[in-house]
């Protein structure tokens, strides 16, 4: 299982340990902000993740899954479309679109906006941010900000770019679980998850959408403590609501990663590849 954090850049050690306790091989690594990497999520080659997937195969993983949160979910969804052999994706607080960069690229610049991702040397089509947006009402100086409105405003401004920037989950053969909270203050993850689910269903492909109206951007799985507060951003939800959503999603996550019980919920497990035992 490849475990990807979002724009925090955190290596998901705690989450990997939770999965290891369930008998899974789990791996997380730094994919931006390290030596020789772009300092921000700016034109990250999606090929960056392929060696980690090969490491999991070398350790005998019989199913390859990617668990991503926020921008990590954006990467996970793209990988399931572009890389062969990914069996399952769990996208937590996902987006249905490719967005512009978050932070600077290798040139040290954040502007002009560029795609967050590249594939085979070419940037993926993306939605830029409309810098005319401002929070309304304005928060007190120095207080953390909810930036969900920026994404909603940018979708309206650049409506002509949404089609090209849509993540083509209808072309992914991976089993898919989406986890999203309706009170997400970072971006509109629940409406975006609903868009992803609709694309899958229209293509006749399985999907599970696990949602809670009162949860925020950072659902917490059983065994994880509350997410720390940020001095810069509001994430929505509450410790109780975020933990409840994570607890509800956890068995679905385990099912799809193991390839078990899927037929009961409209998810048909993919055949297990013949590789060394885990």
Listing of model-derived features with the role each one plays in the protein:
Residues 11-29:
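Short amphipathic alpha-helix adjacent to the substrate-entry channel of hydrolases
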Residues 1-6:
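Short beta-strand element of the alpha/beta-hydrolase
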Residues 129-218:
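Serine-hydrolase catalytic core
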Residues 191-194, 203-277:
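C-terminal catalytic histidine-bearing segment of alpha/beta-hydrolase fold enzymes
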Residues 7, 25, 30-35, 95, ...:
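Short beta-to-alpha linker loops that shape the active-site pocket of alpha/beta-hydrolase fold enzymes
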Residues 20-21, 58, 171:
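Residues at the C-terminal ends
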Residues 32-65:
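Catalytic nucleophile-loop/oxyanion-hole region of alpha/beta-hydrolase
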Residues 9-10, 14, 54-128, 149-160:
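Primarily recognizes the serine-hydrolase "nucleophile elbow" in alpha/beta-hydrolase
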């Amino acid at each position: 299982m490849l475990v990807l954090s979002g724009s925090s850049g955190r290596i998901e050690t705690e989450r990997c340990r939770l999965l290891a306790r369930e008998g899974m091989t789990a791996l997380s690594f730094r994919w931006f902000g390290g030596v020789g990497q772009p300092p921000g999520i700016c034109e990250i080659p999606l090929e960056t993740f392929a060696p980690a997937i090969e490491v999991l195969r070398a350790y005998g993983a019989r199913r390859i899954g990617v668990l991503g949160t926020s921008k990590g979910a954006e990467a996970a969804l793209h990988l399931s479309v572009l890389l062969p052999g990914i069996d399952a994706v769990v996208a937590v607080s996902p987006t249905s679109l490719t967005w512009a960069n978050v932070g600077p690229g290798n040139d040290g610049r954040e502007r002009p906006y560029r795609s967050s991702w590249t594939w085979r040397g070419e940037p993926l089509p993306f939605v830029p941010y409309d810098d005319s947006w401002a929070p309304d009402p304005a928060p007190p100086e120095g207080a953390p900000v909810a930036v969900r409105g920026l994404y909603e405003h940018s979708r309206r401004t650049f409506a002509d770019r949404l089609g090209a920037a849509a993540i083509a989950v209808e072309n992914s053969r991976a089993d898919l679980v989406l986890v999203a909270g309706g009170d997400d203050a970072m971006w509109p993850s629940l409406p975006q998850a609903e868009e992803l689910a609709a694309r899958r269903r229209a293509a006749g492909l399985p999907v599970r959408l696990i949602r809670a109206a009162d949860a925020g951007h950072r659902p917490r799985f059983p065994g994880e403590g509350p997410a720390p507060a940020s001095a810069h951003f509001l994430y929505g939800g509450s410790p109780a609501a975020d933990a409840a959503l994570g607890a509800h999603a956890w068995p679905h996550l385990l099912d799809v990663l193991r390839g078990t019980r899927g037929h009961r919920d409209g998810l048909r497990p993919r055949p297990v590849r013949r590789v060394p035992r885990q």
